[in-house]
Amino acid sequence: MRLDKFLVACAVGSRTEVKNLLKAGRVTVNGKKEKSAKLQIDEERDEIRFDGQVLEYEEFVYYMMNKPQGVISATEDPKHRTVLDLLDDIARSKEVFPVGRLDIDTHGLLLLTNDGQLAHALLSPKRHVDKTYLAQVKGIMTQEDVEIFAKGIPLKDFTCQPAILELVSIDTEKNQSQIRVTIAEGKFHQVKRMVAYCSKEVVDLQRLTMGTLVLDENLQRGEWRRLTKEELEILLASIA
């Protein structure tokens, strides 16, 4: 691996910043100052230090994002901003991608990583990873709807697995409901279509959880952070 790529991967700085830091003599390789960005290193064996601190290479990274509306859950899109546009240069340099998708008008929890094995495990239909959503609904959801969700709703192209519908609040004067829905699948517009089957309409949808991950309530829309060590350990254990 090139030295500059290693330094960027260790969050020392952007590619341009790293070159300047190398020129300034702030990086050593095996005890010797190194100024060549193109130097090939062995990230497992060589000791690389920045300002005297030993750097450790991170192969995989994991970010939690509170995805805002109006942004595409993809790595690139010709028309819209993507979730990668919300990251900084260092995070983007890790070549992360979103695990699954949230519709452009859906907001909430999104996991981004460069760990393909983890992503595959979380998205595998065999694992039935639960996802919980909070929805604002035009119309009054009822106990009958709760039972319909529990049986598995037959949509035009597939039958949903049994889902949990919780009635959070009902406002008969405004003819609206707030509900919490937990599903094991993640088909296109699934929650909206399930609610529409009950003759109501989702007007706002937020994802709260995915597997063991819970959206950090301190993250504002459009903000992101690394998973904590505890969050990552619990997540990895859940798919082991």
Language-model-detected regions and their locations in the chain:
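Basic, flexible Lys/Arg- and Gly-enriched helix-loop patches that mediate nucleic-acid binding at interfaces
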Residues: 1-240
